Amino acid sequence: MFLRAPRERCRPPPVNTFRIGTRGSALALAQAGLTEAALALAFPDLRTERQVFITRGDKKLDLSLLKANEAGGKGLFTKELEDALLRDEIAVAVHSLKDLPGHNPPGLAITAVLERAPTADVLIAKHAGGFEALPDGARIGTSSVRRARQLRWLRPDLRVEEWRGNVQTRLRKLAAADEVAGILLAQAGLERLGFDLSAGTLEFENVTFQIESLAGRLLPAIGQGAIALQSRADRPEVSAILEKIDHRETHIAIRAERELQRLLAGDCSMPVGVFTSLKGDHLHLRAILFSADETLPPITAEAEGAASEPSKIAAEVFAQFP
């Protein structure tokens, strides 16, 4: 993500120390760093401090994220940070927006979002040729229900398996698992961790993996590629700071996506994919929704309209689902 210098340096409202809550993974810390960099551009004199939390999702590595009834998708990676906000221990919680449930807890709000990174999923494979060249029955790892359902729809022959852990852990497991052909990860997370994907390969611990973007094949998760800055609704001094680093175009897009998520009564484990494009004042939203019955085909829907009415566009998409 490229940070654009603000038009003017801002004097922050009176806040002694701006405490930033984050998970402790390398990706979460990188996203906290992007937040700190954006704040430093807007408020050079603002003092920030990190507070790291371990969430239930970080602890319970035995939970299957492909089984929503077992994982309990709502707040699996966010609740501990939200509780800290409600206790007033931190000023802001930094989240991968795709991890957030459709509803904020009472008293909390997504006050700002940083500029969105690329939203595509990528295939990380051991052999060249990409998605179409995967052999019949190839084993593919993912922890996402959305990715798993889209993969099975596109390639019913593939064997999709549970694949948990942080990015580095998953790459090490892939290198060591001769029987697994590849895994799926978000392009945004890989780039934020400093991986160079421009050559179509990924170098990690002396292993070269082949990379293929699945943009156009798989629709991303709601909020994928966006960093959400969540704060208390009753802290106007905090809101005033965060609003200065809010990225308007990203915020419009995620308002449409999260409204659709709310209408579907969904959490981050729901098998729904979305793609939102914003051109000027025109917003287009496309979605794919999978039934609990895996024998049924997915339903696709789309709508477009004024960027000033993201909720209306989401409602039009929702109305096309049975």
Where do the language-model regions lie?
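Short, Asp-centered acidic motifs that coordinate Mg2+ and/or phosphate
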Residues: 90-94, 181-182
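Short, well-structured alpha-helical segments in soluble
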Residues: 76-88, 176
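Short, well-ordered beta-strand segments
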Residues: 19-21, 93, 111, 141, ...
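Small-molecule-sensing regulatory modules
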Residues: 6, 13-61, 67-70, 78, ...
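A conserved helix-loop-strand patch within extracytoplasmic ligand-binding domains
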Residues: 97-100, 106-157
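Extracytoplasmic loops/domains of multi-pass membrane proteins
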Residues: 83-86, 95, 100-103
